[in-house]
């Protein structure tokens, strides 16, 4: 989110060169730069001991492609805690180990998605109401089920080679 007005005093922001950061919104009254804001979220490639990945169907996200577990961080929650919570909520699975993979800017939704690989034991899913379906997919079969170039596709490609 780019500030149009100062959140402290309400004055209209002006564009000003701020050091090496470039031209950004600035409040001349409060004398503060108004840094752009974005939502921090996670996306997780959930894998098991059989070289399979959990892919979800969430019709509110896409009616044509599978997706990965994803969610927004809550205040006071670390990225790792968010991954564990989201996997538990969406799939009913317990995470054994986590590895940070990469961050993915998602400008369309003003988000920064932190990508992780989460290792779990293979078991049946207990789906939340926001997940329409989920399945275990062999690594080599996963990419064609995702929208090519999407953040989920990029993460799965990084994790599965």
Model-found features: residue ranges?
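Nudix hydrolase/Nudix homology domain
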Residues: 1-2, 14, 63-66, 107-109, ...
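N-terminal leader/linker segments that precede catalytic domains of diphosphate-processing enzymes
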Residues: 1-61, 72-124, 161
């Amino acid at each position: 989110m780019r500030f149009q007005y100062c959140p402290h005093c309400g004055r209209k922001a002006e564009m000003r060169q701020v050091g090496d950061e470039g031209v950004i919104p600035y409040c001349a009254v409060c004398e503060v730069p108004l840094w752009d804001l974005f939502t921090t979220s996670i996306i997780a490639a959930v894998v098991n001991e059989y070289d399979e990945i959990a892919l979800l169907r969430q019709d509110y996200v896409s009616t044509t492609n599978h997706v990965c577990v994803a969610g927004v961080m809550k205040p006071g929650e670390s990225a790792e805690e968010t991954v564990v919570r989201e996997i538990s909520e969406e799939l009913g699975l317990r995470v054994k180990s986590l590895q940070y993979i990469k961050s993915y800017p998602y400008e369309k939704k003003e988000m920064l998605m932190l990508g992780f690989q989460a290792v779990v034991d293979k078991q049946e899913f207990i789906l939340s109401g926001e997940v329409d379906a989920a399945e275990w997919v062999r690594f080599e079969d996963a990419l064609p089920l995702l929208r090519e170039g999407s953040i989920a596709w990029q993460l799965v490609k990084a994790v599965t080679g």
